[in-house]
């Protein structure tokens, strides 16, 4: 299949709402079934030698996975909910973040590259939260150079000036970072059947957040359900007065 044919097919698919199919045309082929998406995925050649972004207790039996598009407003409002739950349950659960940039969001992929670039300096989570907090500054910037400078400014502030801004800019175009983004999206689309963002999965079970009246409660209830099954204490950790 030549590039022109692929471009035509992609255009038709987008017109029909087939956004999720883009992944299979845009990435190198690999066996998605070789990966257990309910666990933390290690670095290998398919993901550009970039492991899953994980925070929480090592070896946690309950893993919450989020597939997110940084340009998605729902993902921006989801992050504080997950951060709160992580603080309350972090000694018993783990949290994995995977990128799933939607085709209709023109700056989503570059934002994913920004957090991966920050990750190379150890500032993934700080930059992720900063990009969400300042999304109004970059979501509509179409000029590549201007957008890069906005990302760099957000990165610098998120790291309190400790990050190397020039390295950050250079790494935005790292081929391994692009490979990691494609890898995450392919796993989401082909293995976990992600069709929208944010998508939340707990131990492989996809939560129906679209129809939930209280998303935070839905996630917390599911966490407690799995904690109970695992014989662990349910509810938030007790805090000292």
What is the role of each PLM region?
Residues 1-30, 153-241:
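C-terminal cap of thioredoxin/glutaredoxin-like
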Residues 25-41:
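Ser/Thr/Pro/Gly-rich low-complexity linker/stalk segments immediately outside membranes or between
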Residues 45-62, 87:
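A short beta-strand-turn-helix
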Residues 45-47, 77, 180:
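Short secondary-structure boundary/capping elements
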Residues 49-53, 81-82, 185-187:
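A generic local structural motif
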Residues 54-55, 138, 172:
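Short clusters of hydrophobic/aromatic residues that line enzyme substrate/ligand-binding pockets
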Residues 56, 65, 208:
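Residue-level detector of conserved, well-ordered beta-strand and adjacent loop positions
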Residues 60, 65-70, 76-159, 192-195, ...:
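Structural alpha/beta surface segment adjacent to cysteine/selenocysteine redox centers
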């Amino acid at each position: 299949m030549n590039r022109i044919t692929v471009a035509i097919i992609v255009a038709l698919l987008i017109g029909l709402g087939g956004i999720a199919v883009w992944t299979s045309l845009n990435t190198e082929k690999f066996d998605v079934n070789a990966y257990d998406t309910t666990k933390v995925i290690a670095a290998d050649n398919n993901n550009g030698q970039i492991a899953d972004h994980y925070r929480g207790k090592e070896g946690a039996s309950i893993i919450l996975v989020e597939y997110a598009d940084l340009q998605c407003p729902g993902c921006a409002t989801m992050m504080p909910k997950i951060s709160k739950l992580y603080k309350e349950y972090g000694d018993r659960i783990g949290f994995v973040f995977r990128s799933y940039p939607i085709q209709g969001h023109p700056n989503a992929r570059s934002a994913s590259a920004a957090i991966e670039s920050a990750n190379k300096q150890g500032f993934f989570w700080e930059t992720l939260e900063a990009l969400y907090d300042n999304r109004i500054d970059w979501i509509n910037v179409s000029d590549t150079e201007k957008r890069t400078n906005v990302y760099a400014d957000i990165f610098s502030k998120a790291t309190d000036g400790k990050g190397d801004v020039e390295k950050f800019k250079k790494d935005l175009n790292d081929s391994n970072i692009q490979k990691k983004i494609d890898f995450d999206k392919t796993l989401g689309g082909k293995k976990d059947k992600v069709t929208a963002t944010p998508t939340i999965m707990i131990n492989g079970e996809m939560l129906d957040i679209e129809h939930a009246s209280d998303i935070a409660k839905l996630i917390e209830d599911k966490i407690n359900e799995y904690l109970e099954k695992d014989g662990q204490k349910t509810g938030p950790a007790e805090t000292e007065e």
